[in-house]
């Protein structure tokens, strides 16, 4: 059979998108491991979860490519009439892709939550509990999705052969029931990241950069609602192809959100990007906050406090590699310096020649 996917624009869009994003997802995870080696950190649980997520990302896109190749430019109803066997094979790849997608969603979120735990969880009981609750919620959703998918059609054989007597649940209802709670977990993870970042002694622009970084999770959640809207399209073929397309984009964005925090010590251009973004977007806000802070400090502190450093910045946060959480003690600490990376300690001169050494080496 001739290659006729270009005859339909939606199928062609799906085909090209999956072909492009699949190798990009592999590169994203590969760069993550290069970054880990550069800072001499041992490969951790979160890194292997990212590998698992990448494998299921590839399998999901492969299933989508196989399904669209079997459809080969035809309408769904046309395929059912012309070749019921092709329709059956296409639906088998389709349902396999759904299970791969469920597994990818679980593994990538667990990887992000493991990163949260390494950085914030050990030093904060509340954060640790929230991380565990979100991990448990996503695991329960994964199990529920897998069970529910098996009952979408009764009997299940009708999913692959429309001539079999029975009934199938509406596709829109199925997508709504799956993507809505999935997106809510995405939003909850981003909100948790914002809450954990808030008490850190970072400048406003640094906090903004970290917030935007984890804000990719919002993009993942929003794509879930886009998929829900697409499902209710009047064209079954359009809905079928566009959901697969947006699923590929969604999974890639999740992988990027999972691995991007590791790139700061590997690709200086990433840090430069955040610096430029913060400079252009928040310059006026920083000036206002700086003037307000200066006026308050002049009233509260003596002349010896004017040279105090504001605390660790963006590079220090992303370069943190400790096995302990991010603890920023208020009182000076003169104990051993547990440096697990190659970044030199940041020394903050205090009044009366006291010094506080804080080491951050995140990847």
UniProtKB/Swiss-Prot annotation:
UniProt keyword annotations, A-Z: Glycoprotein, Membrane, Transmembrane, Transmembrane helix
Chain segments carrying region Disordered: 293-312, 344-363
Cellular component, GO annotation: membrane
Subcellular compartments: Membrane
Alphabetical list of InterPro entries matching this protein: Rhodopsin_dom_fungi (IPR049326), SAT4-like (IPR052337)
Coiled coil: none
Highest taxon of source: Eukaryota
Membrane topology qualifier: Multi-pass membrane protein
Task performed by this protein: Part of the gene cluster that mediates the biosynthesis of wortmanamides A and B, reduced long-chain polyketides amidated with a specific omega-amino acid, 5-aminopentanoic acid (5PA). The PKS modules of TwmB are involved in the synthesis of the polyketide backbone, whereas the non-canonical C domain of TwmB is a bonafide condensation domain that specifically selects 5PA and catalyzes amidation to release polyketide chain.
Protein name as it appears in the record: Wortmanamides biosynthesis cluster protein C
Organism: Talaromyces wortmannii (Penicillium wortmannii)
Annotated gene: TwnC
